[in-house]
């Protein structure tokens, strides 16, 4: 066993000197077990002079210089396979729920590995129905694709991800992995209990490295979840759903330790290796000939600035983006998805079909024209518009409200039952609005409803 001693402690970063010149490899896990301290470190740099610089996976409180350190000889390894389902883990793959330890004979895989080779990748394109109108119509998700939910603080990223878990995980019936990266422990706890109540937990593995954890854990916990998902894809040929909330915290944790590791900061103080780290993670989240990983990632946008290097780097890796907009939350439109800024490479006639494509484009054109007219309305009022433009505004407002709907996961707050709307229903509803079939119905009848039939019902109640 290769042993060394702690020579320097700088918060979450620890320097270890090994005698005899036998240094552990980069990414190897080192272990410290002494009195109260039980700590795992990951090798980040070789400094020369027989010394390595490491990042701690839990708090370094109580650690002193001179403490003995063991090299485990391999990267952090976490349990994989069916034993992980229904359980909750930390970054090291240790069970943190109340159901006891994971048996020692369960297979463990290292969290660092190469992305699949180019010839192994799958090129199939198939739409994943979410039951959320604005997503299915304007920025449809691809099965086996990468999806980003972008938004600032408090615009509903976590609620949207929970609704997607509720809709897709239950409809899909396959295996899901949830990685909670640097978010609120309360939300993780709520999600665990919701999933337990609905029974989805039996087919889900959950991994958490929350806000209160040191940056080492927050930086690596996404890889822990990904390793579990990769096993189901590669060894069992499953179609896996991987939820990551929040991928920005992965970058943020990297920037916290970057300066302590002695690297020069780059733009906005981020680590110079930002694009590389993001690429190493994202390239592993992919679909192969054996199975698929569909990943849905929440992306926090600092100060609502989409040009910030963290969200800007994430954009490049995604197949579909769902952009959440604070302006819409202020109007009471939930989910607050911006229909003009959200994108998907699946929105083409070859993939979604001619009718769906035409309806989606007409919806976007109507909303874009309404946006352009808003300045005129603000200055001169509605009366100065031409009859044609008045009709555009009239329909655009109905479309805007019809893009909202109630969520199952928000039922306890709103008191309204959630709705799941199939894609065909969604396309039919918007087509009827564009054709003017519902021009005579009051605007408020379109707000927070499911299908177009619900709108007609609401209108009858309002007019009664």
UniProtKB/Swiss-Prot annotation:
Catalytic activity line of the entry: ATP + H2O + 4 H(+)(in) = ADP + phosphate + 5 H(+)(out)
Membrane topology: Peripheral membrane protein
Entry-linked InterPro entries: AAA+_ATPase (IPR003593), ATP-synt_VA_C (IPR055190), ATP_synth_F1_bsu (IPR005722), ATPase_a/bsu_AS (IPR020003), ATPase_alpha/beta_chains (IPR050053), ATPase_F1/V1/A1_a/bsu_N (IPR004100), ATPase_F1/V1/A1_a/bsu_N_sf (IPR036121), ATPase_F1/V1/A1_a/bsu_nucl-bd (IPR000194)
Enzyme class, spelled out: translocase
Compartments where found: Cell membrane
GO cellular component term of the entry, any: proton-transporting ATP synthase complex
One Gene Ontology molecular-function label: proton-transporting ATP synthase activity, rotational mechanism
Keyword Cell membrane: yes
Primary localization class, coarse: membrane
Keywords from the UniProt entry: ATP synthesis, ATP-binding, Cell membrane, CF(1), Hydrogen ion transport, Ion transport, Membrane, Nucleotide-binding, Translocase, Transport
Protein family according to the UniProt entry: Belongs to the ATPase alpha/beta chains family.
Subunit and partners: F-type ATPases have 2 components, CF(1) - the catalytic core - and CF(0) - the membrane proton channel. CF(1) has five subunits: alpha(3), beta(3), gamma(1), delta(1), epsilon(1). CF(0) has three main subunits: a(1), b(2) and c(9-12). The alpha and beta chains form an alternating ring which encloses part of the gamma chain. CF(1) is attached to CF(0) by a central stalk formed by the gamma and epsilon chains, while a peripheral stalk is formed by the delta and b chains.
HAMAP family according to UniProt: ATP_synth_beta_bact (MF_01347)
Function in brief: Produces ATP from ADP in the presence of a proton gradient across the membrane. The catalytic sites are hosted primarily by the beta subunits.
Listed name of the protein: ATP synthase subunit beta
Species in which this protein is naturally found: Bacillus cytotoxicus (strain DSM 22905 / CIP 110041 / 391-98 / NVH 391-98)
Gene: atpD
